């Protein structure tokens, strides 16, 4: 080893072999970070042919990290193979003669890298030009090398042609098999000088060292967010592009990350491996279990920096913070109404489509929102599980309890930007704001009369239908409005209806 920046590997020639004397950069690995053994081949630009395609594909240190992680198949321009490699692990690690010397004129004018064949130089130039002539017919994703396209297409076909002889586990890419085989050999020649942890691959060590240095070399050009690993960066980019390349074969639902698809597949399999030790309730995702367990512990680890209010979930905190900022980033394309959460917008869209996917099994009544269905079911069971700790009054829904508790605290967190009047609930504020805007979104289907509140529309409809839902408990006389019943009951000397 010459210095922290480079080293020379020499192999004594035997019969039928030639001397290999290669010097390359170690891309920032400090002295001592690379130890002996076969890991040394991962730092050489040229690898003896009989070392196997697996070793040749690992020839350039850091190449896999720069181009997308350890699972990347190198193209011919990188020293890999353009086409399928061996279908199982290499038979041996014996050495063969070094590759042929470069042909005259096979040197890149951009970076000076030399190649043994002109075809490799042509393919290498795509690194500089950004050309990607190989397009996937399934999803349209493009690649610079045909070998990368072949590997990518196995995502769609599910093909995993590279099987481990030790355990039978199969992989889409040969480089993934080579990486996996290190778990059997136990060989970890690359040691971190900061913490002493050892790794089987130099590229993994390079990635690991970023946990010590805090380096984040992958920056998003859209929002400036930086990442330590290219794989995390690529997943983040899908937030901007909307790409969801991982689709469920059972229902077609697509996901931006393969891990999310794996979690989703458990729904079809009926698997709920994460059970609550307190009540036995099981969940598909461990995150769901973590959130649920806070209902037993009353833990609320996400406090608001503005007002100190704490929440069980980070998404609840994010939603709450928008009550301070007034931000409503999710806008309906039909009517322009904006919402704090994307899930609220999805539910609101059903107002325009008329979709009511949540039906009651008891009476068949359908609802656009699942929360409304759950609340409705309690009208059949009579359950009111949400009780006020101050006065004992019980409610069918948690939102009803939350709204009621403000009557004890006197808190009115929702203020009108026009006149400053404050309200206990956001729905009350929205109704009030219509007085300023003149909006009357609730229109009678019988006479086209419009109203500010839905309750006013429901009351008005009874003039058309003749419905009288409020009956006197003394004499049985029915009324269309509660206020009329209250007036009537005074004649009996009784109290007004609650």
Swiss-Prot record:
Q: Provide any one GO MF term from the record.
A: DNA-binding transcription factor activity
Keywords, sorted A to Z: DNA-binding, Metal-binding, Nucleus, Repeat, Transcription, Transcription regulation, Zinc, Zinc-finger
Keyword Zinc-finger appears in the UniProt entry: yes
Q: Where are the zinc fingers (C2H2-type)?
A: 106-128, 134-156, 162-184, 190-212, 218-240, 246-268, 274-296, 302-324, 330-352, 358-380, 386-408, 414-436, 442-464, 470-492
Q: Which GO terms describe its cellular component?
A: nucleus
Is-annotated flag, keyword Acetylation? no
Region Disordered: start and end of each range? 30-104
Q: Which Gene3D superfamilies match?
A: Classic Zinc Finger
**SMART domains annotated for this entry?**
ZnF_C2H2
Major site of localization recorded for this protein: nucleus
The record's section on InterPro entries has: Ikaros_C2H2-ZF, Znf_C2H2_sf, Znf_C2H2_type
Instruction: Tell me which domain of life the UniProt entry assigns to the organism this sequence originates from.
Output: Eukaryota
The subcellular localization recorded is: Nucleus
Protein family: Belongs to the krueppel C2H2-type zinc-finger protein family.
Protein's UniProt name:
Zinc finger protein 497
Tell me the organism: Homo sapiens (Human)
- Recite the lineage of the species: Eukaryota, Metazoa, Chordata, Craniata, Vertebrata
């Amino acid at each position: 080893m010459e210095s922290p920046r480079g080293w020379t590997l020499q192999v004594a020639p035997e019969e039928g072999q030639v001397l290999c004397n290669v010097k390359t950069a170690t891309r920032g690995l400090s002295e001592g970070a690379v130890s002996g053994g076969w890991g040394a081949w991962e730092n050489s630009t040229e690898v003896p042919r009989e070392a196997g395609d697996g070793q040749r594909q690992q020839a350039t240190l850091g190449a896999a990290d720069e181009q997308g992680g350890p699972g990347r198949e190198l193209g011919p321009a990188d020293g890999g193979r353009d086409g399928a490699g061996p279908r199982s692990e290499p038979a041996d690690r014996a050495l063969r003669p070094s590759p042929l010397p470069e042909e005259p004129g096979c040197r890149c004018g951009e970076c000076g890298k030399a190649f043994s064949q002109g075809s490799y130089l042509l393919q290498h130039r795509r690194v500089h030009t950004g050309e990607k002539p190989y397009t996937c017919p399934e999803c349209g994703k493009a690649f610079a090398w045909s070998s990368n396209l072949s590997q990518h297409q196995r995502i769609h076909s599910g093909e995993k042609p590279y099987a481990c002889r030790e355990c039978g586990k199969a992989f889409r890419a040969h480089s993934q098999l080579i990486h996996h085989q290190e778990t059997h050999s136990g060989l970890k020649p690359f040691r971190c000088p900061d913490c002493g942890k050892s790794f089987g691959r130099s590229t993994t060590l390079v990635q690991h060292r970023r946990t010590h240095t805090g380096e984040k070399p992958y920056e998003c050009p859209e929002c400036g967010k930086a990442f330590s690993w290219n794989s995390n960066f690529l997943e983040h980019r899908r937030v901007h592009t909307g790409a969801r390349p991982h689709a469920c074969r059972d229902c077609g639902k697509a996901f931006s990350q393969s891990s999310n698809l794996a979690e989703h597949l458990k729904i079809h399999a009926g698997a709920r491996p994460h059970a609550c030790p307190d009540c036995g309730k099981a969940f598909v995702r461990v995150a769901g279990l973590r959130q649920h367990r806070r209902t037993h512990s009353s833990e609320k680890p996400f406090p608001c920096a503005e007002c100190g209010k704490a929440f069980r979930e980070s998404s609840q905190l994010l939603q709450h913070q928008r009550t301070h900022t007034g931000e409503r980033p999710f806008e309906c394309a039909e009517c322009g109404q904006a919402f704090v959460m994307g899930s609220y917008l999805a539910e609101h869209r059903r107002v325009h489509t008329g979709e009511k996917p949540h039906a009651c099994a008891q009476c068949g009544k359908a609802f656009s929102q699942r929360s409304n269905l759950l609340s409705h079911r309690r009208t059949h069971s009579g359950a009111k599980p949400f009780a006020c700790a101050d006065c004992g009054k019980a409610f069918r829904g948690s939102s009803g309890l939350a709204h009621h508790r403000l009557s004890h605290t006197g808190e009115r967190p929702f203020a009108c930007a026009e006149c400053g009047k404050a309200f206990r609930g956001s729905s009350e504020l929205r109704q009030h704001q219509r007085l300023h805007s003149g909006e009357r979104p609730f229109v009678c289907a019988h006479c086209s009369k419009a109203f500010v509140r839905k309750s006013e529309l429901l009351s008005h409809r009874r003039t058309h239908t003749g419905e009288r839902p409020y009956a006197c408990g003394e004499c049985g006389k029915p009324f269309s409005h509660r206020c009329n019943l209250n007036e009537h009951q005074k004649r009996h000397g009784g109290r007004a209806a609650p």
